[in-house]
Amino acid sequence: MIKPDDDRFIVGNDFPRYTFGFTYGLEYKGFDFSMMWQGVGRRNKWMRGESVEAFHNNNEGPVMDFHQDRWTPNNPDATYPRLTMGAESANNAAKSDFWIQDAKYLRLKNAQIGYTFPQQWMKKLYVKNLRIFASVQNPLTFTKMKGGWDPEYTGD
């Protein structure tokens, strides 16, 4: 007799098969712009925690997208399995390839725009160099992960 706990095999890989990144920058008449992109390919993530064990923090906290659209007799085409609570909550956390997500991504890690004032202007103020800039971190991510999870997240 095969026991369910013995009938398992390795699916997916949490370590990316490859990592890539590139930068781009340009400068024109004192204005500058730069950006850095980074990503990984062929990575899987086994989802755990709140997405699998809904309301596992003492049944408190906000209702998230993955708490909704659960299977019910009235919603047989739901995205997620039936939501259970208490002793039956193991139904949600059953080991299954359902909880493995494609975690490859491409992310704009940093974008920056700036302006460097001409040195002849700065000499009048006894300043050697002055540059103003604005920068943003992680403003854009392309991923197939569901539920709004960060594909760089490495915890459970």
List the predicted regions and their residue ranges:
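Outer-membrane beta-barrel domain signature
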Residues: D7, F20, Q38-K45, G49-N57, ...
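Membrane-embedded beta-strand positions of outer-membrane beta-barrel proteins
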Residues: M35, I132-A134
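Strand-connecting loop/turn motifs
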Residues: Y28-F31, V127-N129
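Repeated loop/turn-to-beta-strand initiation elements of outer-membrane beta-barrel proteins
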Residues: G30-F33, Q120-W121
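Hydrophobic, lipid-facing positions within transmembrane beta-strands of outer-membrane proteins
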Residues: Y18-Y24, F31, L108-I113
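Conserved small-residue
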Residues: M1-D14, N75, K144
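Short sequence motifs at beta-strands and strand-loop junctions characteristic
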Residues: G12-R17, F98-R107, D156
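Extracytoplasmic gating/loop element in the C-terminal half of outer-membrane beta-barrel translocons
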Residues: V40-R131
